[in-house]
Amino acid sequence: MRPRVPRLQPLSEAERAEISAAPRTSTAHRALLARLPAMNAVECGGQAGLAHLHRDFTVLAWNLERCLFPLDSAAHVAPKGPQVLLLSEMDHGMARTKQRHTTEDMARALGMAYAFGVEFFEMGLGGATERSFCEDDDNRLGWHGNAILSAVPFEDATMFRLDDHGHWFTPDAGGDAGQPRIGGRNAIAAILPGADGPICFVSTHLESNARADHRATQFDRLMDGVDRFAPDMPVIIGGDLNTGNSAPPGDDWRDEPLFDRAGARGYDWSLTPAGVTTRPSLITPHPARRMKLDWLCARGLTCLRNALLPSLDATGTPLSDHDAVLATLRG
C-alpha cells in the first residue's frame, strides 16, 4: 500500500543533483525510486459532491497529453456527466503546462475529488514541440502522472508501480534518451462507494516504447495489484494501454496478449467503443498516426452503452492527441 497524502513532497535540490549524477543503471534507478517520497505516495484532494455513485453511472478514460488546457478539458467533458474520470499524462509543476497542477485544476472546475500519483520525475523540459510551450527554463516540480477524478469520496486509494528498472533512465532500456526520467509506468486505484457497495476504479498508462509482451506483463501486475487491494469487488480499468505501439511490421493492437490474459481473469472489453482513439494535436502533429490505444474494461459490472468523445473543443482546437472513451455502467 502507498500512503495517501494531502500534498506530495517536492524533490530537494540535493535529490535532483543526486539523480543527475547517478549512473544510468537499473540498480541505481531502483535505489533512487525507492527513497523519493513523491514517487511512493498518492496525493488526494478536492471535494466530492455526492455520497455515492448512481446505480447507473458514466466513467470516462482520457489521455490528456500533458493537459495543456485543464479548464477547457474540464468544460469539454462536463456535458457528458461522468461521475468518474480516469486520466493519464497529467502534468504537475511542469514548464510546458505553465507549472500548473493540472489534475487539481480539473477537479476544482468539475467539483470533484482527485487522486494523483507520479509516473515520472522528468529531468528535462520534454520533446521539441513541448519545449515550444515553455515560458520557464526549468520545471518547478517536474511531475507527470495518472489520476482519478471522482464525484464521490474516496474510501481508499493507492498506486501500483508496474516497473522499476528505469525504462526511461537507463540508455539500453528503450526509452527516449532525449527525455530522461526517474520512475516508471503505474496505475492509480481507488475504492469508491457505489449504490450497492464499493467499486474499484483504476487509471493506468502502459509503456509505449516496448513490445506487446512487456505491456502484458505490466497488465498482469496491475490485475494482481487489484486482487490484493480490492478482492471480490467490481472493478473498472481504463487508460492508454499503448496497444500496437512499437509493434513489428504487420502487427497491431489485435495481437496484444493482454486482452486474452485479462479475459481469462473475468474482464470484459466490450466497454470500449469501436474506432481509433488518436488524432493530430498541438504536441503530436502527425496526421498519419491513427491508432487504437485507449480502453475500458470491467469485471462484475454491466455495460449499458459506450461512446468516443472527440478531443476537439468548440473552436476545433485539439485538447489532446487522444480521444476519450466513455461507458455507462450499472453497478
Task: Name every feature range the model reports, one short phrase each.
Residues 4, 113-148, 243-319:
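Active site of divalent-metal-dependent phosphoester/diester hydrolases
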Residues 55, 102, 142-145, 184-188, ...:
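Residues that flank catalytic or metal-binding motifs in active/ligand-binding sites
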Residues 58-64, 73-99, 115-119, 149, ...:
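Active-site beta-strand/loop signature of hydrolases that rely on acidic residues for catalysis
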Residues 63-71, 92-97, 180, 210-213, ...:
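Acidic-and-aromatic substrate-binding clefts and catalytic sites of carbohydrate-active enzymes
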Residues 69-70, 93-96, 123-127, 157, ...:
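Short catalytic/ligand-binding loop motif for oxyanion handling, primarily in non-cytosolic enzymes
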Residues 153-158, 199, 302-305:
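Short helix-loop capping/hinge motifs at secondary-structure junctions, enriched
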Residues 3-11, 19-45, 91-195:
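Structured beta-strand-rich core segments of catalytic domains in phosphoester-bond hydrolases
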Residues 30-61, 74-84, 113:
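Eukaryote-specific, low-hydrophobicity, charge-rich regions
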